[in-house]
């Protein structure tokens, strides 16, 4: 395809254009379950901005290589930072665009063009935050979803909490986020999170591309304006503002405390965390 400007370089990510007007973004850290390290967030944000600005593109598909869509943040990186006495968590070494772009450049993105999440496997933490920000979710039957942050002493502070509450209601959102449970694709479909499930043996990316092709066949102007109208109902209270209020307030206290460091360290060491009483 010919573009007005070439796409930006993004590490550990494959960019392809398998059919007209469609961008496919594949997170490619399969050994790390496509966990996203800090330097990758602004790079992905730049890619989504390029996608919005490129006139020839009408729909994007996000997926992961291997057995995971995205397992969230790179907690090994966090643990290494903590061991070196450096800030860990979302605020450490954060790009200024984090509040408006979020995890993977997507979880707080408003943008103007649609993104379909092709969830091929594990979709946890920040991966779940990205999926919830997508316009539609096509999932493999074996995919698993969850926000397990509370089990490791961190918080889903990239936009998922207000969005999840709007999609599934406070009680179900509380069940997922406060208990840290994971859920099968079929249950997520029954909750209204997942649009379509691809049966075992099928290709979730191929199915997402069929959806993307159908969308790309519509008027690009109508799609952009219709999506803007949908977001007007979706974000009556801006999740970006909600995220910033938490992020710039109580979350800083959490980052400075012992429990986040212990949670990340215990995860890397594959042991149960030993929590301290909260001082928040």
From Swiss-Prot:
One of its GO terms (molecular function) is isomerase activity. It is found in: Peroxisome. This is Mevalonyl-coenzyme A hydratase SIDH. The keyword Lyase applies. InterPro entries: ClpP/crotonase-like_dom_sf, Enoyl-CoA_hyd/isom_CS, Enoyl-CoA_hydra/iso, Enoyl-CoA_hydra_C. Disruption phenotype: Does not affect conidial germination, sensitivity to oxidative stress and iron-starvation, nor virulence. Keywords: Isomerase, Lyase, Peroxisome, Virulence. A motif (PTS1-type peroxisomal targeting signal) lies at residues 278-280. Pfam families: ECH_1. It is an enzyme of class 4 (lyase). Gene3D superfamilies: 2-enoyl-CoA Hydratase, Chain A, domain 1 (3.90.226.10), Lyase 2-enoyl-coa Hydratase, Chain A, domain 2 (1.10.12.10). Its EC number is 4.2.1.-. It comes from the Eukaryota. SUPFAM superfamilies: ClpP/crotonase. Pathway: Siderophore biosynthesis. One of its GO terms (biological process) is fatty acid beta-oxidation. Mevalonyl-coenzyme A hydratase; part of the gene cluster that mediates the biosynthesis of at least 11 siderophores, including beauverichelin A, dimerumic acid (DA), Na-dimethyl coprogen (NADC), eleutherazine B, ferricrocin (FC), fusarinine A, fusarinine C (FsC), metachelin A, mevalonolactone, rhodotorulic acid (RA) and tenellin. This cocktail of siderophores for iron metabolism is essential for virulence, and more specifically for the fungal virulence in penetrating through the host cuticle. Siderophore synthesis is also involved in conidial germination under iron-deficient conditions. Belongs to the enoyl-CoA hydratase/isomerase family. GO terms for cellular component: mitochondrion; peroxisome.
């Amino acid at each position: 395809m010919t573009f007005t400007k070439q796409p930006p370089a993004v590490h550990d990510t494959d960019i392809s254009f398998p059919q007209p007007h469609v961008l496919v973004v594949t997170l490619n850290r399969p050994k790390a379950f496509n966990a996203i390290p800090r330097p990758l967030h602004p790079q992905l944000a730049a890619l989504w901005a390029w996608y919005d600005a490129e006139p020839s593109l009408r729909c994007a598909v996000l997926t992961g290589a291997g057995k995971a869509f995205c397992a969230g943040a790179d907690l090994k990186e966090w643990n290494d930072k903590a061991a070196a006495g450096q800030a860990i968590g979302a605020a450490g070494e954060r790009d200024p665009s984090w509040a408006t772009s979020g995890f993977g450049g997507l979880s707080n993105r408003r943008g103007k063009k649609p993104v379909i999440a092709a969830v091929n496997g594990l979709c946890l933490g920040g991966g779940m935050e990205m999926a919830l920000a997508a316009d539609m979710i096509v999932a493999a039957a074996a995919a698993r979803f969850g926000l397990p942050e509370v089990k490791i002493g961190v918080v889903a502070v990239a936009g998922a909490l207000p969005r999840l509450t709007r999609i599934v209601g406070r009680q179900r959102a509380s069940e997922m986020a406060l208990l840290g449970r994971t859920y099968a694709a079929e249950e997520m479909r029954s909750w209204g999170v997942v649009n379509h499930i691809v049966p075992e043996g099928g290709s979730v990316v191929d199915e997402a591309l069929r959806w993307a092709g159908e969308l790309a066949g519509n008027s690009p102007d109508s799609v952009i304006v219709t999506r803007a109208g949908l977001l007007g109902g979706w974000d009556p209270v801006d999740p970006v503002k909600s995220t910033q209020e938490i992020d710039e307030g109580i979350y800083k206290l959490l980052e400075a405390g012992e429990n986040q460091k212990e949670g990340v360290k215990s995860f890397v060491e594959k042991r149960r965390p030993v929590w301290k009483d909260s001082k928040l």
